[in-house]
Curated annotation (Swiss-Prot):
InterPro entries: Spc1/SPCS1. The chain crosses the membrane at residues 19-38, 43-63. It comes from Schizosaccharomyces pombe (strain 972 / ATCC 24843) (Fission yeast). It is found in: Endoplasmic reticulum membrane. Residues 39-42 are lumenal. It is a multi-pass membrane protein. It comes from the Eukaryota. This is Signal peptidase complex subunit 1. One of its GO terms (biological process) is protein targeting to ER. Residues 1-18, 64-78 are cytoplasmic. Disulfide bonds: none annotated. Pfam families: SPC12. Component of the signal peptidase complex (SPC) which catalyzes the cleavage of N-terminal signal sequences from nascent proteins as they are translocated into the lumen of the endoplasmic reticulum. Dispensable for SPC enzymatic activity. Component of the signal peptidase complex (SPC) composed of a catalytic subunit sec11 and three accessory subunits spc1, spc2 and spc3. The complex induces a local thinning of the ER membrane which is used to measure the length of the signal peptide (SP) h-region of protein substrates. This ensures the selectivity of the complex towards h-regions shorter than 18-20 amino acids. SPC associates with the translocon complex.
Length: 78
């Protein structure tokens, strides 16, 4: 499978969107709590960027887990 091609099915798109939404919200909450505990806003930004990069690593490439239910097209009628 070519990872740069970006072929994922509709169920994979939904799964990827859920991972992205939950991952970014969780990253924001963790970053905020950590920044509150250390009383440093720079740490909030730095930790959020690190965690958002990890979420991007999970969501952006076309992993095979996002293409488990490919569409089956009908054959061309002649």
């Amino acid at each position: 499978m070519n990872y740069l091609e970006g072929t994922i099915d509709f169920a994979g798109q939904l799964r990827c969107q859920k991972y992205m939404n939950y991952g970014l919200c969780t990253s924001a909450v963790i970053s905020y709590i950590y920044g509150y505990l250390v009383q440093d806003s720079y740490c909030v930004i730095k930790l959020f960027l690190i965690l958002a990069s990890l979420v991007a690593l999970v969501c952006l490439p076309a992993w095979s887990m996002y293409n488990k239910n490919p569409l089956k097209f009908q054959k061309k009628k002649e």
